[in-house]
């Protein structure tokens, strides 16, 4: 191996350097991993924090826009509410010029508020002064064709006012307008709900152009009942301008501001004013963030919404820029860590190399001393000198003690080599004599091995014959057991047969009794037939005496007598059959008695045969056990003979081996003699 060929200095340097590099690499990798994780956590936290800050900024901007819009509507609401109170005061005061006063006050109020497009005041029929019939068609008094007060002042442009009395057709127009509600919703909503209503934005023509507007309608209540409606039309162009201005303030105009009504219609859109009055698209495009802030334009109305939309890329731009700066800083820090780790590893390798050199320098000095001893003709009187008490000092000390022990041993070996040479000569002579004795012993063991083989063959024959006899005895034992089972089964069958014959005898006796009963019945029938015959004969005689009058009766009497005679004949035949049946039954009963006695005798003989068969089985089992013992003994004798044969063969092999070893011992003795001479020459090289 290349590693084995390296010096200790390089091995220490290499292994320690690898460990140092592994530790430095592990520390640097751990530092880089932790830095990467920290950077990821910081990036995630920064992104979340900046996104949250941006969302809060969007929410705050939406609240600001909502407050501006709410203030715009609240100004109009306060204006309408104030005018409604004025109308209520004027109505309560009354007077013949009430309609003219209301018309003048409405004009003055509208002229003072140029942002309002129109102001209207509508009373229920005869709800103002109970004089609608006196003002038919008087538009200047705000009365329509039915005399109903339905005043409408419009302001197409600031300072330009136009008076109109709304006709009944307009007040009752329920057709659907552009905002999806009835055109007279401005009137019916406060009447039906008795609450302030704000209509969905709708388009109306003002000075020849379509203007998006809405209406705020307030009910006039009297004793809890709606008697009229005050309303004002507000243009929503200011809302569009608010949305455009809000977009400029939203991330340098990169977002979008929309104002949506309660029904989802657009009242303002900073991107496209052509969609005003149309439903807002509720779907959000990918990569776009939408924030909606609800607000109530005026009290007691459905909430509107200020909807802000901003691309997520714009929202995340500060976080992305910060993350990029952090990534650049982390890369520089990682590069610095790598350079520091590399410099540390190089410095550590240099220190390890110097340390290894300091450790191996004394070892090289000791090796040089050992080389000097080895090359100095085996002088065992020289010793190593090393003054330090470190591991190398222990090595030199123990080596000197080893030489202290080795020097007298070598001296003794040199003195005993001559004695070893003489002993080797004597060993050669003894080995030759041992070889001759081994040859004689080998011939005698050959004869013993032949006799052991013959005895082993005889023992095998005996074991084989005994095994066959044991098998035959086992077969006989099995046959006797089967015979015993058959005899027992036969005995049980005979017992069942005897029981069946007893039952049959009882039934035969019962049959014989029933046959006797049948004979008695037949005897009664025969007697009845004889009496019937006599009665029929007497009847025939009486009929003959009667002449023609008894001829029919004579015919019947003849028929009855014939039937009685046939009955007697049939009864006689049945009696003969019954007597034959009774005789057969008696014969069967006698045969059954004989069979029963024979079955009982057979069962008794079977009972006697069972013990004999059991004794035969026991004797056969004893014979089988003895044969098995004989076979086992013969097998053991054969095994012993085989063992003796193997032992004799082993002794023969050992004898042959000993003979060969004796010859080999003689040769070894001669070789020992030569080796002793060589060792003597070698020992002469050491100086003790």
From Swiss-Prot:
Location of the Cache domain: 50-284
Effect caused by changing residue 164 to A: 20-fold decrease in affinity for putrescine. 7-fold decrease in affinity for spermidine. Increases affinity for cadaverine
UniProt keyword RNA-binding present: no
Residue positions binding putrescine: 202-204, 233
Domain (Methyl-accepting transducer): residue spans on this chain: 416-652
Pfam family name, one: HAMP
Transmembrane feature ranges: 12-32, 335-355
A GO CC annotation given for this chain: plasma membrane
Cited function: Chemotactic-signal transducers respond to changes in the concentration of attractants and repellents in the environment, transduce a signal from the outside to the inside of the cell, and facilitate sensory adaptation through the variation of the level of methylation. McpU is a chemoreceptor that binds and mediates chemotaxis to polyamines such as putrescine, spermidine, cadaverine and agmatine. Also binds histamine and ethylenediamine with much lower affinities.
Record protein name field: Methyl-accepting chemotaxis protein McpU
Organism the protein comes from: Pseudomonas putida (strain ATCC 47054 / DSM 6125 / CFBP 8728 / NCIMB 11950 / KT2440)
Phylogenetic placement of the source organism: Bacteria, Pseudomonadati, Pseudomonadota, Gammaproteobacteria, Pseudomonadales
